[in-house]
């Protein structure tokens, strides 16, 4: 009952090349690989350059389309670019999860209309998570996926400690 997602996180795209994409695609043929991810854009850090991240994001969306696998999307401080690129690439046809969703209701509505699930984790318990709590109240329950992002983003009362699935009850209670 163990399955995998195969993809390159945006923070690792500076080292990505076509040979690695071919290797990822060959891995996606394995019956235990069920998604392409975690792929997307991360503008929190200055590197890798946004243009490099965008290039490989599109390339991995194309890989998901060709392998007929859903996607797991990473988007940090890149709401507009991520959404625009996903629309342009018709990512709604693939479906998947917006991992660690952290934007507001308007962006959530766009993703939900595309058929994506929203990943909700420990951040929803933070005092400054008002927008995310509004999203959780707005979104249909069947469109939410509980996540840990282990070992990161532990919920209150364990914020700053190592996260694990043992903390999911705090996310549910939020």
Stretches with model-predicted labels:
Residues 1-2, 32:
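A generic structural motif
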Residues 173-174:
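Short glycine/serine- and small hydrophobic-enriched flexible loop segments
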Residues 8-10, 102, 122-126, 150-151:
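Short, acidic/turn-prone active-site loops that include or flank metal/cofactor-
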Residues 115-129:
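His/Asp/Glu-enriched short active-site or ligand-binding loop at hydrolase and phosphoryl-transfer sites
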Residues 124-127, 145, 153, 165, ...:
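Flexible, gly/pro- and Lys/Arg-enriched active-site loops
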Residues 10-19, 23-114, 134, 139, ...:
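Divalent metal-binding pocket/active-site signature
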Residues 5-6, 34-39, 141-151:
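Non-cysteine beta-strand/loop elements that form the S-adenosyl-L-methionine
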């Amino acid at each position: 009952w163990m399955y995998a997602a195969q993809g390159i996180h945006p923070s690792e795209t500076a080292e990505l090349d076509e040979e690695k994409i071919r290797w990822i695609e060959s891995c996606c043929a394995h019956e235990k690989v069920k998604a392409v991810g975690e792929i997307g854009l991360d503008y929190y850090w200055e590197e890798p350059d946004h243009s490099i991240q965008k290039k490989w994001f599109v390339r991995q969306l194309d890989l998901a389309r060709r392998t007929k696998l859903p996607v797991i999307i990473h988007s940090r401080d890149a709401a507009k670019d991520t959404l625009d690129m996903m629309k342009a690439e018709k990512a709604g046809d693939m479906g998947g999860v917006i991992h660690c969703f952290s934007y507001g209701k308007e962006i959530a509505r766009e993703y939900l209309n595309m058929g994506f699930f929203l990943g909700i984790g420990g951040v929803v318990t933070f005092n400054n998570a008002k927008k995310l709590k509004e999203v959780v109240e707005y979104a249909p329950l069947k469109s939410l996926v509980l996540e840990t992002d282990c070992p990161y983003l532990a919920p209150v009362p364990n914020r700053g400690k190592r996260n694990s699935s043992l903390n999911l009850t705090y996310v549910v209670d939020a």
